[in-house]
Amino acid sequence: METEPRIILMDTTLRDGEQTQGISFTPAEKTNVAKALLNKLRVDRIEIASARVSEGEMDGVMRTTSWAEDKGFLEQIEVLGFVDHNRSVDWILEAGGRVMNLLTKGSENHCTNQLRKTLDEHLKDIRKTLKYAHQNKVRVNVYLEDWSNGYRDLPDYVYDMVAGLKDEGVARIMLPDTLGVMSPDQVY
């Protein structure tokens, strides 16, 4: 049985960072914005924080996940995590989260120059983090950071990365073009 294609909206407004330069939400503001996004605007998913950033972020995530669990939205609350074996997963669990968006390197340039690792070494580290997350019942989506440059520079790197993740229990592989490198014609 085929399912119809569906566009799923994920809002990242609450994840303080480059997408919200100069903006920082208090824990109460974060929870209020999350309520509006999920209750009123009916956004499918929201990424509300980066793991391990601060106590303020922890407080904001705890407040938001507590509300979300009471209202049946907990599976729609997502937190950016890192390839750090257990540290991000433990932080997310402590904050009451159940979904991690794992930031991985989507270009050979980032993998070799930022991590100083080969793709195989990076995949080994990713699998270690994924295994720990799954053992703790955390659902994981994966971001391929800089994939658009990676695809333009060395498409096989991106294909090999996706192939290396396809049997690892990843719910979604996300391909954000945060730098605006690709045009719609190039990705559709």
Locate the predicted segments by residue.
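Short catalytic-loop micro-motif centered on adjacent basic/acidic residues
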Residues: 45-50, 76-79, 175
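N-terminal active-site wall of soluble small-molecule enzyme domains
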Residues: 52-80, 84-89
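Alpha/beta enzyme core
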Residues: 4-9, 15-45, 66-72, 85-141, ...
